[in-house]
Amino acid sequence: MRRILVTGAAGFVGGHVLPRLAAAGDRVAGIGRGGAPRLPEGVAYETIDLLDEAALSAFVARFRPTEILHLAGLASVADSASGPGQTWRVNVNGLMNLVAAVEAVPGCTFFFVSSGEVYGSAFLAGHALTEDSEPLPRNTYARSKWVGEQLLRDLLPRIGVKLVVLRPFNHIGPGQDERFVVASFAGQIARIEAGLVPPCLEVGNLSSYRDFLDVADVAQAYAGLIGRAESLPDGRVFNISSGMPRTIASALDGLRDRARVPFEIRIAPERVRPAEIPLAAGDAGRLRAATGWRPLVAWEDSLTRVLDDARARLAASRETGRGADPRS
């Protein structure tokens, strides 16, 4: 039986991957900064900050994982730009603390969730990139992930821990907060429908092409790779992507078609990223060859799920009197 530790278990992706890992019959434990999320039966959870080295080391030594899925970290490009110091502290110092803790469990496999963002300027080639493309990160978040990859390649072999690098591209789904573009559109639409704000949706650059996946497909990719940990080569990198880029405008159009009321669109200068990459897409052929994975959730269903979730969360927040927190 595997003993799988998931960091960042209370976050967006954690809520989708924990049930898949638990369903395989393995022992699963999660850690995160927040309180315990709704957990599948049999999954343990403990509130631990990655920057608390002592607590982290004690938990790893006690649980003794055979696989680690490292989801935890700051994931917003915009937040990283406005607060680079905190990004480096969490994404690199926190990672260093986890590596120190993992010294207690030689022989385990460390699945590091990096990001398709690390390719950066390489996307200017204008086509879907394979894992052989040279990363040329362009922002603080991407640089922190690329440094994390290099750090692990240096440190894990010294302690007998296998490394597998995961580079997911944009993913959407229930539970994502509004720092991310599709969730932001959905949250704004839900508030417009409820009459809480004027019927005007604020957007940034709509012409960029991005490689979107449903979070359920990303979670399945993670679970499939973890289930084959023994056969994966040390240091292997896997893109997790559809290979079918779509414009951000097409996501907005799809949500607009599902909206219950009409609304206008306004370009908000503060939402426009400087020097935006026109097209970012990944080739996941290596992942398909290794596990047979392919995306199963239709794009239209993903958009419906995102908007329904935004409506449900808004309704729940109004019932409890909290108002609508776009970052929840």
Regions found by a protein language model. Name each.
Residues 122-127, 150-210, 215-224, 245-248, ...:
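NAD(P)-dependent short-chain dehydrogenase/reductase
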Residues 15, 68, 82-111:
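NAD(P)-cofactor binding segment of oxidoreductase domains
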Residues 200-201, 205, 234-238, 246-253, ...:
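C-terminal "lid/loop" region of Rossmann-like NAD(P)-dependent oxidoreductases
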Residues 4-23:
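N-terminal Rossmann NAD(P)H-binding glycine-rich loop of SDR-like oxidoreductase domains
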Residues 2, 299-328:
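Amphipathic terminal alpha-helices
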Residues 50-90:
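NAD(P)H-binding glycine-rich loop region in Rossmannoid oxidoreductase-like domains
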Residues 215, 237, 250, 269-301, ...:
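Conserved C-terminal active-site "lid" loop/helix of NAD(P)H-dependent oxidoreductases
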Residues 82-97, 118-165, 170:
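Catalytic helix-loop patch of NAD(P)-dependent Rossmann-fold dehydrogenases
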